Amino acid sequence: DAHDLTNIMPWSTEESIKASLRERLNNTKVFIILIGEKTKFHHKFVRWEIEQAIKKGLPIIAVNLNGKRYHDDDLCPSILDTELAVHVSFNQKIISKALSEWESLHNQYKREGKTGPFRYNQDAYTALEL
């Protein structure tokens, strides 16, 4: 868990927080963002962290806490509207599937020039009994 590498304290400066987040991103293979009611409006660090993940070419898994299985226009930060990312519901089975498959799919789609939000179809959820 990259978030266990360093502690961010309430009195940390913006520069030290970004340095810590950068270190965490340097030690990850997949970027997971939890999409909740307020995620879209957290511009200072959430947007910056997404920008860094995009610059690094990290595969992005967007997890909708509200259970939606697709890109949620109302809650997802707009920076992800056209970025290559898979959007899934907040469920361990589908998140595990995304963690095991999305990195290679992301790389394949990048080579093919594909962008935009992706999602698993109903068959994938049904196969997981969801």
PLM regions and their residue ranges:
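Conserved beta-strand-loop-alpha-helix hinge of the TIR/SEFIR fold
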Residues: 24-52, 58-69
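A broadly tuned preference for mixed-charge, low-complexity surface segments
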Residues: 17-31, 80-89
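Conserved BB-loop
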Residues: 1-21, 36-43
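C-terminal interaction surface of TIR/SEFIR-family domains
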Residues: 69-130
